[in-house]
Amino acid sequence: MSRIPSSFDYKDNVKDVSEMDFMEKLVFRAKQQPLVPIGCLLTTGAIVLAAQSVRSGNKNKAQVFFRWRVGLQAATLVALLAGSYIYSSNKAERKTEEQLLKEKAKMREQLWIQELERREQETEARRKKAEMFRLKAKENEEASKNLEQELKALESKVNASK
């Protein structure tokens, strides 16, 4: 059965986290807590610079970069914990948002059902109207046949009286 388009249709680009693939989840989580990926990149940069310093034999610079790594890793961990705390405090707010979205979806479904029922009523009204016109046409046809018969009867009387 083909789907009837409706004025209530619209595309929902919002996906549930469980429906997302790996890259979409990664981007979604990075947008939720932007400091964590930045901290990870900075920590990785500090490790790379420390490794280069160790290879070149510069122990003092390597030590500084390893200290930076520890500091950046700690900052990333703090950002992660703070973000999860903030994110969990917004959980109740998100729940109400989700409930509003569910209510909106139910409302859209109700409107869609009402629109389908309205269309069905219109179709039924057209069907009844067409049937009524067919009956009237049949009645008119029968009436015209009766009039033709009466006319023939009158013509035969007129011809008989001449």
UniProtKB/Swiss-Prot annotation:
Main localization of the protein described in the UniProt heading: mitochondrion
Cysteines joined through disulfide linkages: none
PROSITE patterns per the UniProt record, alphabetical: HIG1
GO biological process, one term: mitochondrial cytochrome c oxidase assembly
Residue stretches spanning the membrane: 35-54, 64-86
Occurrences of domain HIG1 (ranges): 7-98
Keywords (A to Z) from UniProt: Coiled coil, Membrane, Mitochondrion, Transmembrane, Transmembrane helix
Pfam families: HIG_1_N
Stretches of the chain forming a coiled coil according to its record: 89-162
Subcellular location: Mitochondrion membrane
InterPro entries, per the entry: Hypoxia_induced_domain, RCF1
GO CC field: mitochondrial inner membrane; respiratory chain complex
Bilayer topology term: Multi-pass membrane protein
Biological role stated in the UniProt entry: Cytochrome c oxidase subunit which plays a role in assembly of respiratory supercomplexes.
Protein family per UniProt: Belongs to the RCF1 family.
Protein name as catalogued: Respiratory supercomplex factor 1, mitochondrial
Organism field: Vanderwaltozyma polyspora (strain ATCC 22028 / DSM 70294 / BCRC 21397 / CBS 2163 / NBRC 10782 / NRRL Y-8283 / UCD 57-17)
